[in-house]
Amino acid sequence: MKLIWSEESWDDYLYWQETDKRIVKKINELIKDTRRTPFEGKGKPEPLKHNLSGFWSRRITEEHRLVYAVTDDSLLIAACRYHY
C-alpha cells in the first residue's frame, strides 16, 4: 500500500520530529497498523462524518488524531496533529 502525505500532514509530522519523538513513534505504529488493517486495530479507528466523510481517524494522544483515507492501493495521511 502506497503512503501519501498531504502537505499539512507532512508539516505536522516534521513538527513532531522536532518536538516529541514519542509521538513520532506512535504515528509510525498507527500507520503500520493502518496499512495492515485500515478499519480496525490500534488507536480506536472511527469513520468521520459530514465534510470529512470517507476519512477515518485514530487516536495518537487524547488531544491529537491521525486522519487518513484509504483507496485500493494507497493510504492518504490528511493530518497527524490536533483534532479534525
Curated annotation (Swiss-Prot):
It comes from Escherichia coli (strain K12). The gene is yoeB. It holds the Pfam family YoeB_toxin. Disruption phenotype: No visible phenotype under standard growth conditions. Delays Lon protease-dependent lethality upon overexpression of Lon, but does not fully suppress it. No loss of ability to form persister cells. NCBIfam families: toxin_Txe_YoeB. This is Toxin YoeB. Belongs to the YoeB family. The keyword RNA-binding applies. One of its GO terms (cellular component) is toxin-antitoxin complex.
